[in-house]
């Protein structure tokens, strides 16, 4: 994949990360030539079959030869199959989830969005896992006690809106010490979660733990998350970085349509998380 190779090239030039390239060597060389990439300083492992290439690549990470795993030209289904491989994959026993990190102009803090790409309809248990996975990423980038906003259309609990009930339950679990390393406050609407000015006009805002300063936006389902994500990327043109979380090592899972800059950001995020995991595991 040309965008992936170009991202790898830029990441190396910026001293973010080096790479071991696994795949059809002839194709890699052909693509590298088209983007003026010098391969003389890269290790290339020649594997013609894409499925076997993915399996080989993920084994390098699970064996500790490499620090993170990045999706190349293989389709997402094949890539995830290698991540979940029982022999050489990166399973930990924890549920996997996807996190996107945005640096939004006008918002003082980084925003961590989850899950926008992996879990379609998260249960309460899934949401606990998503929070735990995303909190670990926050800790890795230097946010010791991130604020988590379980999002809904309203800020009050309404039995007819199960999302609000689950958000309140997550808040209670945090208060009882069942969810740690963060502050959970929900249900919250998006404006109350990330916009201090809007939050000040909401009834009861002064009693909330989050008033426009949420770090983690926990979406009720993949539809809400994906729509917000794509609006931010394609309308507001906000660049981000993405990781699959809950694995033994960082997994860079980006879309083929993502720009080189998004892929470089994802590698940078993965490098920071990999270093954190090494120091804390």
Question: Which residues does each predicted region cover?
Answer:
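Anion-binding alpha/beta catalytic cores of soluble intermediary-metabolism enzymes, centered on
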Residues: 1-210, 215-281
């Amino acid at each position: 994949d040309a965008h992936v190779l170009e991202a790898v090239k830029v990441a190396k030039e910026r001293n973010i990360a080096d790479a071991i390239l696994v795949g059809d060597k002839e194709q890699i060389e052909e693509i590298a030539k088209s983007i003026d990439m010098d391969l003389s300083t890269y290790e290339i492992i020649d594997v013609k079959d894409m499925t076997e290439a993915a399996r080989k690549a993920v084994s390098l990470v699970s064996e500790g030869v490499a620090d993170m795993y990045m999706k190349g030209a293989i389709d997402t289904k094949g890539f995830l199959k290698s991540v979940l491989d029982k022999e050489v994959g990166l399973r930990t026993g924890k549920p996997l989830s996807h996190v996107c990190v945005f640096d939004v102009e006008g918002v003082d803090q980084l925003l961590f969005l989850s899950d926008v790409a992996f879990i379609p309809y998260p249960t309460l248990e899934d949401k606990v896992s998503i929070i735990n996975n995303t909190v670990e990423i926050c800790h890795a980038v230097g946010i010791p006690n991130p604020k988590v906003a379980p999002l809904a259309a309203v800020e009050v609990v309404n039995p007819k809106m199960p999302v609000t009930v689950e958000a309140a339950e997550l808040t209670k679990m945090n208060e009882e010490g069942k969810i740690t390393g963060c502050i959970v406050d929900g249900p919250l609407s998006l404006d109350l979660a990330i916009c201090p000015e809007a939050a000040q006009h909401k009834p009861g805002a002064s009693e909330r733990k989050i008033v426009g300063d949420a770090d983690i936006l926990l979406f009720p389902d993949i539809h809400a998350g994906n729509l917000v994500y794509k609006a931010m990327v394609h309308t507001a043109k906000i660049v981000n970085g993405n990781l699959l979380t809950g694995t033994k090592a960082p997994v860079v899972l980006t879309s083929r349509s993502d720009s080189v800059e998004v892929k470089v950001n994802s590698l940078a995020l993965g490098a920071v998380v990999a270093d954190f995991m090494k120091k804390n595991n």
